[in-house]
C-alpha cells in the first residue's frame, strides 16, 4: 500500500474514532500516536497533518460536504463515508501537491475497501462536484 494511502487510512482511523466517541480529532490523534510502536511509520507525518488540518477546518469542510450531498445530511451518512469525504475535501482545498483526481480516487478506493457497496459512487459524485467548485 502506498505511503500516502496508509496515511489516509490512519487519518481515517483517528477521525472515525473521534466521530464515534464525540471527541476532538486532535485529542484522539494524541492518544493514537502515543500507542504506536517505535519507530514511527514514515507516513505518520502526513496523517497527523491531515487530522490537524481537518480539525482546524472541520466546520467549513462539513458545510461544503452537506451542501453537495444532495438528499443526505452528514448525520445520515455512514461514518466512514463522512470521514473519507472530510479527508478528500481537505486535500482538494488545502493540499496543493495532491492532484484533485488523486484525492478523489484515493477516497473512492478506501470506500471500496471499507464501506458499503454504494459508497464509492456516492463519494465520487460528491467529491467531483466539490472539485469543480474548488477550481473556480
Swiss-Prot record:
Biological process (GO) annotations held by this record are:
DNA-templated transcription termination; transcription antitermination
Question: What's one GO MF term for it?
Answer: RNA binding
Keywords, comma-separated and alphabetical: RNA-binding, Transcription, Transcription antitermination, Transcription regulation
Do you know which Pfam families this protein is assigned to? NusB
Note whether Cell wall biogenesis/degradation occurs among the keywords: no
Q: Which InterPro entries match?
A: NusB-like_sf, NusB_fam, NusB_RsmB_TIM44
**Which GO CC terms are listed, alphabetically?**
cytosol
Instruction: Give the family per the record.
Output: Belongs to the NusB family.
UniProt function note: Involved in transcription antitermination. Required for transcription of ribosomal RNA (rRNA) genes. Binds specifically to the boxA antiterminator sequence of the ribosomal RNA (rrn) operons.
Q: What name has this protein been given in UniProt?
A: Transcription antitermination protein NusB
Native source species: Salinispora arenicola (strain CNS-205)
Amino acid at each position: 500500500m502506498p505511503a500516502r494511502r496508509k496515511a489516509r487510512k490512519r487519518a481515517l482511523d483517528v477521525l472515525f474514532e473521534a466521530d464515534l466517541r464525540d471527541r476532538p480529532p486532535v485529542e484522539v490523534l494524541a492518544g493514537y500516536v502515543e500507542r504506536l510502536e517505535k519507530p514511527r511509520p514514515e507516513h505518520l507525518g502526513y496523517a497527523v497533518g491531515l487530522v490537524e488540518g481537518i480539525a482546524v477546518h472541520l466546520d467549513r469542510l462539513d458545510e461544503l460536504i452537506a451542501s453537495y450531498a444532495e438528499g443526505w445530511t452528514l448525520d445520515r451518512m455512514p461514518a466512514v463515508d463522512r470521514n473519507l469525504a472530510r479527508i478528500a475535501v481537505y486535500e482538494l482545498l488545502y493540499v496543493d501537491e495532491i492532484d484533485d483526481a488523486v484525492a478523489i480516487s484515493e477516497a473512492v478506493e478506501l470506500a471500496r475497501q471499507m464501506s458499503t457497496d454504494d459508497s464509492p459512487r456516492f463519494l465520487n459524485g460528491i467529491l467531483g462536484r466539490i472539485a469543480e467548485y474548488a477550481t473556480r
